[in-house]
């Protein structure tokens, strides 16, 4: 299921506290500054370099413009929309059934513990539902208790444990997206 094409520059989701908008090249420095051991371990797969992060942001922009299966948002806070982290939706991917959408997120250290990731997940679930997603899936390594807590607070229920293609155990959390349209 491919999402519909949206104007990249105009895309914003907000609940009045958190604003989600597509990643852009001027986010690269803030992302590199905010990256820590937890983001590297659980989300990024390795420390970012300027070249790698710029290439990823360009890829994300191309996905938005081509209505591809990836939707990568910056999690922004405050009037100035300071970058606090990222959240990605994948409408296709490893071990996803038709209609399922993978949600992956991470906050920079100074923004953790404020409920921002939960708000971002709720916002992105509404967007995924509006794009035809039927069920959201969050895949978390068992020792990543913070991400599991975000999933539960955002209305996800524990699903079956799975193995990733590299053999890592992942706890799956799932949420029916029908109710997300009304949030």
Model-predicted segments: where are they?
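GNAT-family acyltransferases
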Residues: 1-110, 127, 131, 157-160, ...
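Residues lining the SAM
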Residues: 37, 139, 154
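Ser/Thr-centric signal marking residues that sit
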Residues: 86, 118, 140
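Conserved acetyl-CoA-binding loop-helix of GNAT-fold acetyltransferases
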Residues: 105, 113-130, 145-153
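Short amphipathic helical patch at the helix-1/turn junction of helix-turn-helix
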Residues: 107, 141-142
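Conserved GNAT acetyl-CoA-binding A-motif
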Residues: 131-140
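Conserved beta-strand edge residues that scaffold enzyme active sites
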Residues: 142-143, 165
């Amino acid at each position: 299921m491919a999402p519909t094409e949206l104007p990249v520059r105009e895309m914003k989701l907000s609940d009045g506290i958190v604003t989600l908008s597509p990643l852009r090249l001027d986010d690269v420095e803030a992302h590199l500054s905010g990256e820590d051991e937890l983001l590297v371990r659980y989300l990024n797969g390795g420390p970012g370099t300027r070249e790698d992060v710029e290439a990823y942001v360009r890829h994300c922009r191309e996905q938005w413009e081509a209505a591809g299966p990836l939707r990568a948002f910056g999690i922004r806070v405050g009037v100035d929309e300071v970058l606090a982290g990222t959240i990605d939706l994948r409408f296709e991917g490893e071990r996803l059934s038709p209609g399922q959408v993978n949600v992956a997120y991470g906050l920079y250290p100074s923004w953790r513990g404020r409920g921002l990731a939960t708000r971002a997940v709720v916002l992105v679930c509404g967007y995924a539902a509006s794009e035809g997603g039927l069920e959201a899936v969050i895949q978390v390594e068992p020792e990543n208790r913070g991400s599991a807590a975000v999933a539960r607070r955002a209305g996800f229920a524990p699903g079956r444990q799975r193995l990733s293609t590299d053999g890592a155990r992942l706890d799956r959390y799932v949420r029916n997206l029908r109710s997300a349209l009304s949030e």
